[in-house]
Curated annotation (Swiss-Prot):
Catalyzes the transfer of a dimethylallyl group onto the adenine at position 37 in tRNAs that read codons beginning with uridine, leading to the formation of N6-(dimethylallyl)adenosine (i(6)A). The gene is miaA. The lineage of its organism: Bacteria, Pseudomonadati, Campylobacterota, Epsilonproteobacteria, Campylobacterales. InterPro entries: Dimethylallyltransferase, IPT, P-loop_NTPase. The record marks S73 as: Interaction with substrate tRNA. Its EC number is 2.5.1.75. Belongs to the IPP transferase family. This is tRNA dimethylallyltransferase. Its cofactor is Mg(2+).
Length: 276
């Protein structure tokens, strides 16, 4: 297939995280053009809006008829497809001030409920990411988030995208994750994270990712090497289960199949798309 690849992966977008993200090798990237890799420094934040901008840029400059969007950040994909409201523009100085304000709240969800019951009703009390984003809007605009979204409605994605997901038998998936974890550790995962953890702020977004956060616990002597491996495998399995459930419940017209079936379906679809 004559195509290019857009990486929708919340870890591969960072520079210097190569092992933990299982980033494509330089050789693989030389043969096939990849977008959205090595775009951010460790202390910068990624979000759905950034990926949407990068995806639109990639679609504009790609010389191929097909752009494959590949990755596990399904929440971002759903946000991009359904549309995103324009977020308020705030300076770095304001971001620090807002973060400080939010960190002083004893119960962020209760506070959100008090200033905007409408938006709070739509967010689960444990969904810290969305609570945080809503509070950022409030502190940046001094407007309840629900009113802000009313004034800045979502704009659905303008391009049609076909969706495919892999269905892998549980024991095979566990075996694959186990082998991948062993390979990562053997390739120098801990050393990679140690170099970054000593260099960047401890609250940097990538340090919360699976494979990274467990390595940090190992470096802080809270886990043995065996426990580190087991924790990465266990947490990756849980994530895979969540991703699978999310994909099946949140996307319409999702083609699910084995590696062979999905490959065949993508090839058939790409041929008809090019003809069309």
């Amino acid at each position: 297939m004559d195509a290019e690849i857009f990486s929708l992966d919340s870890l591969s977008i960072y520079k210097d995280i190569n092992i933990a993200s299982a980033k494509p090798s330089l050789k693989e990237r030389k043969n096939i053009k990849h977008y959205a890799l090595d775009h951010l420094n460790i202390d910068e934040k990624n979000n759905a809006q950034l990926f949407k901008t990068l995806l639109e840029d990639a679609m504009r400059v790609s010389s191929k008829e097909i752009l494959l969007i590949v990755g596990g950040s399904s929440f971002y994909l759903k946000s991009i497809l359904e549309g995103l409201s324009r977020m308020p523009k705030i300076s770095g100085e304001e971001v620090v001030k807002i973060e400080r304000e939010i960190s002083t709240l004893a119960d962020p969800y209760a506070f959100l409920k008090s200033i905007d019951p409408t938006i709070a009703f739509k967010i689960h009390p444990n969904d810290t990411y969305r609570i945080h984003k809503a509070l950022e809007i409030f502190y940046a605009t001094h407007t309840p988030p629900s009113e802000y979204f009313k004034a800045n409605p979502k704009k659905p994605f303008e391009h049609a995208i076909s969706l495919f997901a892999l269905s892998i038998e549980k024991s095979t998936l566990h075996s694959n994750i186990k082998q991948r974890t062993k390979n990562m550790l053997h390739s120098g995962l801990v050393e990679e994270i140690k170099a970054l953890y000593t260099q960047y702020p401890k609250d940097s977004q990538p340090f919360k990712a699976i494979g990274v956060k467990e390595s940090i616990l190992f470096l802080e002597k809270q886990l043995t090497l065996k426990e580190l491996e087991e924790a990465i495998i266990s947490n990756t399995m849980k994530l895979a289960k969540c991703q699978n459930t999310f994909n099946k419940t949140q996307f319409n017209n999702l083609y699910v199949g084995s590696v062979k079936e999905v490959r065949h379906a993508i090839l058939n679809h790409s041929k008809s798309a090019i003809k069309g």
